[in-house]
UniProtKB/Swiss-Prot annotation:
InterPro entries: KH_dom (IPR004087), KH_dom-like_a/b (IPR015946), KH_dom_type_2 (IPR004044), KH_sf_prok-type (IPR009019), Ribosomal_S3_C_sf (IPR036419), Ribosomal_uS3_bac-typ (IPR005704), Ribosomal_uS3_C (IPR001351), Ribosomal_uS3_CS (IPR018280). This is Small ribosomal subunit protein uS3. It comes from Paraburkholderia xenovorans (strain LB400). NCBIfam families: rpsC_bact (TIGR01009). Residues 232-242 have a biased composition (Basic and acidic residues). Residues 248-257 have a biased composition (Low complexity). The keyword Signal does not apply. Residues 216-268 are annotated as: Disordered. GO terms for molecular function: mRNA binding; rRNA binding; structural constituent of ribosome.
């Protein structure tokens, strides 16, 4: 079922994290969830030209902390920080608690699934051919380090009468592998002949799970030569009875017949 399930929900608590990080009892949960949805819709409209990829909402101890991930943080902040202050006051009015807003820059917008999907939908609304927009996005993502990408568009493509679905893939996108870092996003293009949906999967490589440790290759230590080693190398292994004792002491040697005064000669 890796092809059908939501890639982010499938990997929650394994390699992905939640977009809303707070706890609530049964009485307040629905209201707080609806509040988060309203905040995200407001930020999507307000920061339409700021290339916002993700919004993370946290609620620590009667406060709210909102982190906005954008590839154009200057547009969010505005001249001398005026826009960010207006945004903060509006969010405080909507949420009813003090709000802290953080801006994080997306270093590679070409490999962010949400920004890719939004870029394709904007091109479709400007009547650019969908195949050209999809293939250009795939080439840019692969050029900047993505290991695989898949893009699917569905609807009345190019204004045809019957809706259809087309998708393209480059590289590999392992949807069943839990340790695979799959970035997934969707977007909609509102055209004159209907809505066109765009889905994007970006494979950025494997990530370490909670119980995994990084694999370090063992480097074999160089064998240092002994100080008094013979030039020929190590000695050959000794046989039984060799070395360490008097002559004739090895096992199985014939005993002398003569005494000590016969000069060591054997009896004739």
């Amino acid at each position: 079922m890796g092809q059908k399930i939501h890639p982010t929900g499938f990997r929650l608590a394994v390699s992905r994290n939640w977009a809303s990080r707070w706890y609530a009892n049964n009485n307040n949960f629905a209201a707080m969830l609806q509040e988060d949805i309203g905040v995200r819709e407001y930020l999507k409209k307000k920061l339409k030209n700021a290339s916002v990829g993700r919004v993370v909402i946290e609620r620590p101890a009667k406060n709210a902390r909102i982190t906005i991930y954008s590839s154009r943080p200057g547009v969010v902040i505005g001249k001398k920080g005026e826009d960010i202050e207006l945004l903060k006051s509006e969010l405080q009015r909507r949420m009813g608690v003090p709000v802290h807003v953080n801006i994080e820059e997306i270093r590679k917008p070409e490999t962010d699934a949400q920004l890719i999907a939004d870029s394709i939908t904007q091109q479709l609304e400007r009547r650019i051919m969908f195949r050209r927009a999809m293939k250009r996005a795939m080439q840019n993502a692969m050029r900047l380090g993505a290991q695989g990408i898949k893009i699917m568009s569905a609807g009345r493509l190019n204004g045809i009468e019957i809706a259809r679905t087309e998708w393209y893939r480059e590289g590999r996108v392992p949807l069943h592998t839990l340790r695979a870092d799959i970035d997934y996003a969707t977007s909609e293009a509102k055209t004159t002949y209907g809505i066109i949906g765009v889905k994007v999967w970006v494979y950025k490589g494997d990530t370490l799970g909670r119980n995994d440790a990084p694999v370090v290759e063992e480097v074999a230590e160089e064998k240092r030569p002994r100080r008094n080693a013979r030039p020929g190398g190590d000695r050959r292994p000794r046989r039984d009875g060799e070395g360490g004792g008097p002559a004739g002491a090895r096992r199985g040697a014939p005993r002398r017949a003569g005494g000590a005064g016969d000069g060591g000669k054997t009896g004739e």
